[in-house]
């Protein structure tokens, strides 16, 4: 029986793997996200399906990255919604299938799409019509490893996983044996208002972890968990984060105050997308395959995302947690937040 963390606020059930009744807001969406990273950081990828029934569209993103090589990206923010009760998507450029094999235990992703080749990550924010194209085929399965983590106050859950299958780029096929995470959420999400950091990975000793911080100006109990090697998932109290950005807007590093294992995340390869709101505002979303280095020397790999709505540079991007812990962390590294 899979372990499900119980915060005492709402009860996650197998049925929550299915689609939910839409809410009233224009930006109400149902989101499914899947990622993976090879144990040596040599390849990583992610898929996200976002359904906007009140906006009459679906978003579909898929990206494969390999450090030092161009990103392979599928990004369609105006796809037609799937048929009633379905999460399968078909457009002129892609055929995507999503299957819950066993609720809260395993899921499969299939994709056959025309992707673009991005030698420079920032090109994802420009028009992609003239970019080189390549066929991208995914056949991957996510199997739960350690438990399931519902967020305390939001209809959302995260599941650390073992990931297996194949990735084909053009005529080259790579067998995947990796680790990753999948999540599912439903509700109104305004990408153009709130900035946040979300991070998930696995260290070399087998410890998996997750943490999220929204830049809302004050501290709350941020969602965070860890899974010890061959153990079960448990909630962590006290996560917070700080990020340094370059002049180009891309993150250079994030300091993650993961309780019991403080980490530094360094992006190895970016997989960004841009999003335009119904009224024309633009948000950037520079997701990245990262190398994580724990203060005790352990190294691992995974994914971090930084949502950047209009005005994002003024949102702080610094520790929103126990100030004594954050101040000690800064002092220990010369006060530079790096």
Where are these regions (language model features)?
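Structured soluble/peripheral alpha/beta segments that form catalytic or ligand/cofactor-binding pockets
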Residues: 1-338
